[in-house]
Swiss-Prot record:
UniProt function note: Catalyzes the GTP-dependent ribosomal translocation step during translation elongation. During this step, the ribosome changes from the pre-translocational (PRE) to the post-translocational (POST) state as the newly formed A-site-bound peptidyl-tRNA and P-site-bound deacylated tRNA move to the P and E sites, respectively. Catalyzes the coordinated movement of the two tRNA molecules, the mRNA and conformational changes in the ribosome.
Entry protein name: Elongation factor 2
Organism (species): Aeropyrum pernix (strain ATCC 700893 / DSM 11879 / JCM 9820 / NBRC 100138 / K1)
GO molecular function: GTP binding; GTPase activity; translation elongation factor activity
Matching Pfam families: EFG_C, EFG_III, EFG_IV, GTP_EFTU, GTP_EFTU_D2
Location(s) in or outside the cell: Cytoplasm
Gene Ontology CC terms, in alphabetical order: cytosol; ribonucleoprotein complex
Length: 736
């Protein structure tokens, strides 16, 4: 304990000096050794004893992770390191590497300035590595590389020194290609990995040694010596970790190549914050000014016994306990009750945290990850950090019910808390059946959520088999339909058509949003998606499933007064479409004309909602409607001789092969496969390749369900939801 107490006061002192702070994360494909690497760093910072570093897996402090051996929650730790005689504080934010949790990865990247990319020397760059490098570069986070598990090249593959070096060159080249592909021009050259400059480390996190090219020269070590150490056995390998400790190599590299927070914020803020850079707040963030107005971005929220703990980065100003602040997304005031810094999974209370640092706060009641907190008085002119875009969308649903009926209130509360901790989980109640539906990014994501319900919240639940979430859409423009209100006093004339891919992509990437300036938005849509500029200016709403509402009317009386009601009706109508009560995606709803009653009593939601819904639904049914199913992208690597077996499995599961590459004896297959077919995929691939294939999955997109399956699928979904077997007819919706 002594060392740690000493470190808190030391750390508080250094936190004031921004040149001596670094904010980094470790990103990697699942099982490439990210947590073990974090452990070696923790051991070195004196928070855990060195002896247990490899086994302790301190960052994996939830039991779930121990059993599965994969990290689920991003935790933060402050490390202490001396470099060239100067003390530094390094905030290390742990990020999950498993595809199902990529929402958390995106969120942690926003608070980092640099990332150690960990790559398994044998497996090389995998899909997930590629995804996280791309995301890091999009957030202007500088990557440095650690090639891990070099012991596998020596022990399993028994490669000679020159072959080992050749493997390193291949991996560095692959990562540099990604930097070429995804980095913005101004960073491309500077951030390219140069091993001779020391931007790449090689080693084994499990055996706690690591080395870089400059160190090889300085310490006069050769790879032949490292190979010999493994031939000699445990003690010789332990010597390696004394001679060239991994933490020293990695943390030296971090201090040398990752910018300090002020330097990083100068080029990162214009990219990740969409407010006015010339405003007082904008300037304070560019300069990471501890005396400026407070801006604190929350990237992680946990529920603990004492309440909600919100972790994030102070971009400007200083977090002080007891101060009153404003939450931009929630739109309300709150008080900072307790401010603390992290050490391992533990927090140490401190009085204040200046700009550039990562800290944790208690006292916010219903804060969500992605919130921006500012000083009181600045709520009017401070923009929130971008509404976070996640790479995946929830695509699999299970129905959950408590084993003991009296646990229902407890389960409902636990589900509410789970969705606060993980915004990628969505909870809905099926009004008809009273079921609680939990949707997530994949079977594993939901499995972990169920385990959390049991272990963290103590609720025993039964879950239905996983159900795939579909979307409804149209394939052609519909006719114009008249939607009448029940009292016949209001009429809306509406048609529905598909949005083009360009528009969908712009909305998905956050380039086009609902709260944008209409002129800017219209310009982007006209330039990049072929919209008519005047029509694009008349967009009223864009909902979360990428549907757009356009008002093409001219001079309709009382329309302004009911605009909000019509928009709410549009959102409701598309939450559950007419085919199978699934969310509608990718449609443009156009209002051509309307007759609105002059008396507000006769034009309330009860009258307008049905009119909007019936006209939109009729339009959908008239526009060659279909269901879209979610696809997963698979990245499979296996020995060449299993290629035909793998292809057979994929074809049987309606998979589509996108690309096949072969290097030496290995084949890499990139394919897209419907999520509906992927539940037993792991088992089938294992048996088809005698367990020698490894693969990654990520969300790929939506595609129309094959026509021959459509009617059957609609009937099945409707039956499951307790709806009449066939969808409504147009005449049922807009009768005479």
């Amino acid at each position: 304990m002594g060392a740690r107490v000493k470190v808190v006061s030391e750390i508080e002192k250094i936190m004031r000096n921004i040149d001596q702070i670094r904010n980094i994360g470790i990103i990697a494909h699942v099982d490439h050794g990210k947590t073990t690497t974090s452990d070696s760093l923790l051991a070195a910072a004196g928070i855990i004893s060195e002896r247990i570093a490899g086994e302790a897996l301190v960052l994996d402090y939830l039991n779930v992770e121990k059993q599965r051996g994969i990290t689920v929650k991003s935790a933060n730790v402050s490390l202490y390191h001396e470099y060239e005689g100067k003390p530094y504080v390094i905030n290390l934010i742990d990020t999950p590497g498993h595809v199902d949790f990529s929402g958390k990865v995106t969120r942690s990247l926003r608070v980092l300035d640099g990332a150690i990319v960990v790559v398994d020397a044998v497996e090389g760059v995998m899909t997930q590595t590629e995804t996280v490098i791309r995301q890091a570069l999009e957030e202007r986070v500088r990557p440095i590389l650690f090639i891990n598990k070099v012991d596998r090249l020596i022990k399993e593959l028994k490669l000679p020194p020159e072959k080992i070096q050749q493997r390193f060159v291949e991996i560095i080249k692959e990562v540099n290609n990604l930097i070429d592909l995804y980095a913005e021009p101004e960073f491309r050259k500077k951030w390219k990995l140069d091993p001779n400059a020391g931007m790449v480390a090689f080693g084994s996190a499990k055996d706690k040694w690591g080395i870089s090219v400059p160190q090889v020269k300085k310490k006069g070590i050769t790879f032949r010596e490292i190979i010999q150490a493994y031939e000699k056995g445990k003690e010789a390998v332990a010597e390696l970790s004394k001679k060239m400790p991994l933490h020293e190599t990695l943390l030296d590299m971090v201090i040398k190549f990752v910018p300090n927070p002020r330097e990083a914020q100068r080029y990162r803020i214009p990219k990740i914050w969409k407010g006015d850079i010339n405003s007082e707040i904008g300037q304070a963030m560019l300069n990471a000014d501890p005396d400026g107005p407070l801006v604190f971005f929350i990237n992680d929220v946990r529920i603990e016994k004492a309440g909600l703990v919100a972790t994030g980065r102070v971009f400007s100003g200083t977090l002080r306990s007891g101060e009153e602040v404003y939450l931009l997304n929630a739109g309300k005031k709150s008080r900072l009750l307790q401010v603390s810094i992290y050490m391992g999974p533990f927090r140490e209370v401190t009085k204040e945290i200046p700009a550039g640092n990562i800290g944790a706060v208690m006292g916010f009641e219903d804060v969500r990850a992605g919130e921006t907190v500012v000083s009181l008085g600045y709520e009017e002119n401070a923009a929130p950090f971008e509404s976070l875009r996640y790479v995946s969308e929830p695509v699999v649903t299970i129905a959950v019910e408590p084993v003991k009926i009296q646990d229902l209130p407890k389960m409902i509360e636990a589900l509410r808390k789970l969705t606060i901790e993980d915004p990628n989980l969505v909870v809905k109640i099926n009004e008809e059946t009273g079921e609680y539906l939990l949707s997530g990014m994949g079977p594993l994501h939901l499995e972990i959520a169920l385990t959390m319900l049991r272990e963290k919240f103590g609720v025993e639940v039964k879950a239905s088999p996983p159900i795939v979430v579909y979307r409804e859409t149209v394939r052609q423009q519909s006719r114009v339909f008249e939607g009448k209100s029940p009292n016949k006093h209001n009429k809306l004339y509406i048609s529905v058509e598909p949005l083009n891919e360009e528009t969908i992509t712009l909305i998905q990437n956050g380039a086009v949003t609902e709260d944008q300036d209409p002129k800017d938005r219209a310009r982007i849509l006209a330039d990049k998606a072929g919209w008519d500029y005047n029509e694009a200016r008349k967009i009223w709403a864009i909902d979360e499933n990428i549907n757009v509402f356009v008002d093409k009317t001219a001079g309709v009386q009382y329309l302004r007064e009911v605009k909000d009601t019509i928009i709410a009706g549009f959102r409701l109508a598309l939450k559950e479409g007419p085919l199978a009560a699934e969310p509608v995606r990718g449609v443009k709803v156009v209002l051509h004309d309307a007759v609105i009653h002059e008396d507000p009593v006769h034009r309330g939601p009860g009258q307008l909602y049905p009119a909007v819904r019936n006209a939109i639904w009729a339009g959908i049914l008239d526009g060659r409607p279909t269901l879209l199913e979610p696809l997963q992208k698979l990245d499979i690597r296996a020995p060449m001789e299993y290629l035909s077996n793998i292809t057979a499995v994929l074809t049987r599961k309606r998979g589509r092969i996108i690309n096949v590459e072969t290097t030496g004896v290995m084949a890499r297959i990139i394919a897209a496969i419907p999520v509906a077919e992927s539940f037993d995929l792991a088992g089938e691939l294992r048996s088809a390749t005698a367990g020698r294939a490894f693969w990654g999955v990520e969300f790929y997109g939506w595609a129309p369900v094959p026509d021959q399956m459509l009617q059957d699928l609609i009937a099945k979904i409707r039956q499951r939801k307790g709806l009449p077997p066939s969808p409504p007819k147009i005449d049922d919706l807009i009768g005479p």
